[in-house]
Amino acid sequence: MSKDIPTPYMWSYQPQMGLAAGASQDYSSRMNWLSAGPHMIGRVNGIRATRNQILLEQAALTSTPRRQLNPPSWPAAQVYQENPAPTTVLLPRDAEAEVQMTNSGAQLAGGARHVRFRDRPSPYSSGSIKRLIIRGRGIQLNDEVVSSSTGPRPDGVFQLGGAGRSSFTPRQAYLTLQSSSSQPRSGGIGTLQFVEEFVPSVYFNPFSGAPGLYPDDFIPNYDAVSESVDGYD
């Protein structure tokens, strides 16, 4: 096997902290070529070299440029801010009140806010302007003949002012609330961002340099939280 074609380091995810727990070489992905001839060995090395090149290009495309490969806390500017799903609330209904209003031919149409204007009910003087009070009844807009009687309809159907549907619908009414975070989240990252940020690392000639230059993240017993290697000072 050519030493110039290393086996990639596979990152593991720490879900409680949202960090990478470390990386180790995945020897299970290596092809068995011990009984192969020189031609087969060359083809195997070609496949491994192509795989490493693809991983390097993928890391360059999806990884965020940062000084520290595996930071213990990600700033909010580099963390994917997921939008929470909207909250749906079932609106309460008073079936008994709806039936009573329908039977009595009640009409709901608009509303007014009571405002006082310095000891008088309106901003205009009652003597200068004659107010015309208009009273009316809602009508049902359908294919039936509109009744001109002043009393409630015999079928108890009434019109909600400003709406095209009469009476109360038996269907339930829901209120959808869009929830959003008031402050961007920082700290750990999610699984989707982890897959994009921590592509299997290709570390060339891992054992050819000084021991102090070897990345701590590639040591199996490395602790990403304390940034130390278990068993070493």
Curated annotation (Swiss-Prot):
<keyword id="KW-1048">Host nucleus</keyword>
<keyword id="KW-0167">Capsid protein</keyword>
<feature type="site" description="Cleavage; by viral protease">
    <location>
        <begin position="163"/>
        <end position="164"/>
    </location>
</feature>
<comment type="similarity">
    <text>Belongs to the adenoviridae hexon-linking protein family.</text>
</comment>
<dbReference type="GO" id="GO:0031423">
    <property type="term" value="F:hexon binding"/>
</dbReference>
<keyword id="KW-0426">Late protein</keyword>
<feature type="site" description="Cleavage; by viral protease">
    <location>
        <begin position="111"/>
        <end position="112"/>
    </location>
</feature>
<feature type="propeptide">
    <location>
        <begin position="112"/>
        <end position="163"/>
    </location>
</feature>
<comment type="subunit">
    <text>Interacts with the peripentonal hexons as well as the hexons in the facets. Part of a complex composed of the core-capsid bridging protein, the endosome lysis protein VI and the hexon-linking protein VIII; these interactions bridge the virus core to the capsid.</text>
</comment>
<feature type="modified residue" description="Phosphoserine; by host">
    <location>
        <position position="180"/>
    </location>
</feature>
<dbReference type="GO" id="GO:0042025">
    <property type="term" value="C:host cell nucleus"/>
</dbReference>
<dbReference type="Pfam" id="PF01310">
    <property type="entry name" value="Adeno_PVIII"/>
</dbReference>
<keyword id="KW-0597">Phosphoprotein</keyword>
<keyword id="KW-0946">Virion</keyword>
<feature type="modified residue" description="Phosphothreonine; by host">
    <location>
        <position position="64"/>
    </location>
</feature>
<protein>
    <recommendedName>
        <fullName>Pre-hexon-linking protein VIII</fullName>
    </recommendedName>
</protein>
<dbReference type="InterPro" id="IPR000646">
    <property type="entry name" value="Adeno_PVIII"/>
</dbReference>
<dbReference type="GO" id="GO:0019028">
    <property type="term" value="C:viral capsid"/>
</dbReference>
